[in-house]
Amino acid sequence: MLSYQDKVGAFYKDNARANSSKLSLVTEEQGGRRPPYLLFVLLILLVGIMALLAITGVRFHQVSTSNMEFSRLLKEDMEKSEAVHHQVIDVLTPLFKIIGDEVGLRLPQKLNEIKQFILQKTNFFNPNREFDFRDLHWCINPPSKIKVNFTNYCDTIGIRKSIASAANPILLSAHTGGRGDIFPPYRCSGATTSVGRVFPLSVSLSMSLISRTSEIINMLTAISDGVYGKTYLLVPDYIEGEFDTQKIRVFEIGFIKRWLNDMPLLQTTNYMVLPENSKAKVCTIAVGELTLASLCVDESTILLYHDSNGSQDGILVVTLGIFGATPMDQVEEVIPVAHPSVEKIHITNHRGFIKDSIATWMVPALVSEKQEEQKSCLESACQRKSYPMCNQTSWEPFGGGQLPSYGRLTLPLDPSIDLQLNISFTYGPVILNGNGMDYYESPLLGSGWLTIPPKNGTVLGLINKAGRGDQFTVIPHVLTFAPRESSGNCYLPIQTSQIMDKDVLTESNLVVLPTQNFRYVIATYDISRGDHAIVYYVYDPIRTISYTHPFRLTTKGRPDFLRIECFVWDDDLWCHQFYRFETDSTNSTTSVENLVRIRFSCSRSKP
């Protein structure tokens, strides 16, 4: 064990206080070496402080620059906001005011313009006012007409699309109820009654001409999908300086619009006039796709030359768009291109239609090919039974012993190609009436209805199916029969040996209605009653029924022309009729044009 002294010595050995005197000496010795180190430390501190000051200065400069940039951007944003504010105040607010004025003020003004238009029309028909052809501009361009600016258009296709877009709202109202059935339903067990009414044409160009002393001859009308077209010869009471003829050929086209009480209104939107001596004595008509097309000739019979020896006569082609001042308005003479077998064609009052930018008409054609087949058909039919046509030695319209065939005239209206009239032919039922062959659109794809009107009270007329495609065929449908004595494709029209009704002075053309089910209409000028009347006959071959309705006339006379064109409007039958007659009292010729409506109803229906 350690002694007390050892413990004390150990304590002082390990304890600082045991060597305090030595430590004090060492400390004093080290204190003499402090100044160099302190200077070095102070130098480092000074450098650090200067670096911090430099960094602080740089950061301060950056912050100042950022503040200046932020102030500049803020100022720009405030300027833009101020500009937007002024834009709203100076531009949008007046624009909203203009829109409000258009809606609140222009609409009543538009109604007032329509009112003024009606008043102007009333004044226009004032007999005391001298007629001026140029005054018709306001009549066919009323304030409600859609204006289209064609200045910047060079492409005809673009123009057609613009016109179609502008016309669609008008056509949509006309399509409603345009394909419905006009007859009472099958469940009708009671009597079927018909109610008819006559309406004048108010804003049609031809109606304004008839109201004057001017005379209209041979009017043709075609109606298709809410658009109508007309062509006629006008004999005015005076002649303007630009015409050196006594007759003027007029073409007009327009919309069928809804008017008061939803009745159809024929409103002219475009027209064209030509002197008769410009090969416009005889003209056809076709309407469709917002366009009118017509073929005009001096003489009805056209001789076709297929070599360079003969001088081929041209055919005048007239096209008219629904609106004026467009490339669709054309007058051009074309040389027809025909099959070598076609020797002649005969153009009279023909109604066609336009589909897929192709205008199509049907006409009688004289063909040298396969004449023996047609003659053998007639000879075999006449071997055992004598039909009235068996004794004929001359056939309309060309005369002589050659039977006419069916000719088809097609006129492509594609703006990318030049106008060209193509003539093709085919055979079908024997043709007994050489004047007036009409072509109506059919719901069936690639075909149409070809009609030939009755004649002299002995020929009932006929209706055939005619193809529109490359394979041109004519197939009998109604008013024809196949003789038992003949074989093959041999059909004859129905013909009587004597006039069936001597009270019928004239008959109209046959009209096929644009309905889903096959219906057709014909009208006659009848004098069997105390008052003369135009009697309508409406046929439904599927149900083997027909309806009649007479429209009594306030005048009496001898008619020389009767033409109708019918359409369906809100499930009622509407017909445009034009007829000329010589009055018994004054021996003067009078032309009448109007619209008639026939409404069929059932008195009692099955539950």
Swiss-Prot record:
It is found in: Virion membrane; Host cell membrane. One of its GO terms (cellular component) is virion membrane. Coiled coil: none annotated. Its main location: virion. The chain crosses the membrane at residues 38-58. One of its GO terms (biological process) is symbiont entry into host cell. It is a single-pass type II membrane protein. Residues 59-607 are virion surface. It comes from the Viruses. Residues 1-37 are intravirion. InterPro entries: Hemagglutn/HN (IPR000665), Sialidase_sf (IPR036278). GO terms for molecular function: host cell surface receptor binding. Glycans are attached at N149, N309, N391, N422, N456, N587. Disulfide bonds: none annotated. Keywords: Glycoprotein, Hemagglutinin, Host cell membrane, Host membrane, Host-virus interaction, Membrane, Signal-anchor, Transmembrane, Transmembrane helix, Viral attachment to host cell, Viral envelope protein, Virion, Virus entry into host cell. Belongs to the paramyxoviruses hemagglutinin-neuraminidase family. Non-sialidase subfamily. Attaches the virus to cell receptors and thereby initiating infection. Binding of H protein to the receptor induces a conformational change that allows the F protein to trigger virion/cell membranes fusion. The cellular receptor might be SLAM, and may explain the lymphotropism of the virus. Binds canine SLAMF1 at the cell surface. This is Hemagglutinin glycoprotein. It comes from Canine distemper virus (strain A92-6). The lineage of its organism: Viruses, Riboviria, Orthornavirae, Negarnaviricota, Haploviricotina.
